[in-house]
Amino acid sequence: MFDQTTNTETHQLTVGKIETANGTIKPQLLRDAVKRAVTNFFAQMDGQEAEEVYEMVLSEVEAPLLDIIMQHTRGNQTRAANMLGINRGTLRKKLKKYGMN
């Protein structure tokens, strides 16, 4: 469940970059963090075969993303959907999928 506390730093998502009160954060930072996490995951697999990695990675990234966006918007689904670039119905389905409704 998402916490409706206020976020002290104002974020504005834009195509290709994230604008914050402190300047621009390049999406490459996020990509690098995901790459490190997936690399570490496979290192821990110790040669074992992994299955459904795509779905696992998406759900492990999507759930905290939704939680953080919902916190930032104080539970406002319309604002959250706009920030994510998806429609509100899709957001509702995703929130339900992760038990955040």
UniProtKB/Swiss-Prot annotation:
Organism: Shewanella sediminis (strain HAW-EB3)
The entry's DNA-binding region: 77-96
Keywords per UniProt: Activator, DNA-binding, Transcription, Transcription regulation
Database matches in HAMAP family: DNA_binding_Fis
Role played: Activates ribosomal RNA transcription. Plays a direct role in upstream activation of rRNA promoters.
GO molecular function per UniProt: DNA-binding transcription factor activity; sequence-specific DNA binding
Any Pfam family the entry gives: HTH_8
Subunit structure: Homodimer.
Name of the protein: DNA-binding protein Fis
Family: Belongs to the transcriptional regulatory Fis family.
Cited Gene3D superfamilies: Homeodomain-like
